[in-house]
Amino acid sequence: MEAGELARLAEVVGDETFGEFLAELEPSDAAEIVERLSSAEAADVLEAMAPDDAVDVLSRLDPAEVRQILVEMEPVEARELEELLSYPPETAGGRMTPAFVALLPDVRVDQAIVALRKVAAEVETIYYAYVVDEENRLLGVVSMRELVLSPPYRTVGEIMERDVVKVRATADQEEAARLLVEEGLLAVPVVDDEDRLLGIITVDDVADILEREVTEDIERLGGSQPLEMPYSRATPFYLWRRRVGWLLLLF
């Protein structure tokens, strides 16, 4: 579609629906579409996306274009995305979303449930609420099930799980993916070196990481891992050198 048609489509379906559509694409494909929108139009669409999805798209754009889009955004959302962009895309920090629920330990159970109800539509998941102190250091985690089953007069600090599975923001994204799978979790908190809660990574965020990791393992087993260049540009000698070991083994 032409740039004008894309802008018209975004206007007709609404920024939120258009953002959902972009989130389903490969980030590189979504970035190509965003590039054909004006900075203001791109800002509106990216604001409607989940922060982690928006960052995946922005990281594929030219830095000058990213700065222009961020200028057009609401200051709070722009700062959120700038912070996420400060982490390399292959790290846990680059994969996390800041849309999580955090509670102070002295909040009562009934108050916590009311708070969760208010923010449910804005956060990534409400299955877990993270308990932090006044300096945002991670103290524990409480599940929605635990909140519902606990007496309303008890505090979150009394019922929270203190042994929290967490990952550093600088850790490789595959470490976060493995933690989610091995521990059977729906989300894992991301913290800095001082244990301050920065964001969360949910299981759907790492599904593509796990798929890619398994694909690479299977390709390696079959000797068919991708080449460093397109087949159309590979010389016969290069192809022979890459495959001869496996061919000899198969013979």
Regions found by a protein language model. Give the residues of each.
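Core alpha-helical transmembrane segments of integral membrane proteins
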Residues: 226, 230-251
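Hydrophobic packing positions in regular secondary-structure scaffolds
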Residues: 1-226
